Amino acid sequence: MKICSLLPSATEIVCSLGLEDQLVGISHVCDYPESVLKSDAVIITRRSSDLSGLSSQKIDEIIKFNREQKIATQIVDGDLLKKISPDVILTQELCYVCAVEYGAVCEITLDILDYQPKIVSLKPAGIQDILNNILLIADACDVIDEGNRVVDSIQTRIDFISNTLAQSNYKKGPKTFCIDWLNPLRNTGQWIPELIELAGGNEGLAEKNGKSREVSWSEVVDYDPDFIFSMPCAFPMYEVDSASRLAFSEVEQFNEINAVKKGQVYLFDGQVPSRHGPRFIDVLENFAAIMYPDLFNGLFNTGMYTKYSL
């Protein structure tokens, strides 16, 4: 079977199912596991605008302009798609910024291919949706038993955290503020507030399984979170650090926030929490280990985050 994955989350799911050798096409942002970059899979997408090295504000301006002008943020190379002729194409309907949209994929397959591949589109809002998507891809690729194994393994790790917290008789968890974008400031949505809740926290400014929204720093100051997790979408760690420092330096009352006073501001690799693949469980475990180190001493930092220092 020949599989083409047009988003990193789906690529990670495919590899977790043991199907990496069946990937014939990937997107330009598929980078995990690192072995996919050395595989025979062809990169068949590109950005319509070069966003490398730009500030959060500039990226936001370009994305909004492209949207207004109906310019696709991600583009599929039709010639390459025809060349690899996949049996299964994995796409998404969640975010027009992060990957090629489902509608565009359907359109190009009709125009370019002389057959109809199986198109699987993902649109998760919560954790159960992510688990269901693992099974959906497993079923489409005829490895449903392996899909069940992956889901069961993840569920076991979720249950460990839930049961440990329940047995500890912890009360109302700490207030958290998770940052999805720095300028304009946006909180997180979809599965992140749910992960915080499962880890024993309270993402009070966000809606579980809802959409990210713009917030003001005055809202954050009034909310006064106990923890701040900066994880701007798709930013690698070095960009998270520089962008967060710049944004924080411009907030007059930043040092008055409880999380800052207690040294409980953390910078996350933005390429991991934003993905709806199997590694969401690593994000959950890291949230739990940060907020409850005495309970989850065995859960360690996998290089996903670092503590922010002034």
Where are these regions (language model features)?
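N-terminal ligand-binding lobe of clamshell/alpha-beta domains
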Residues: 1-310
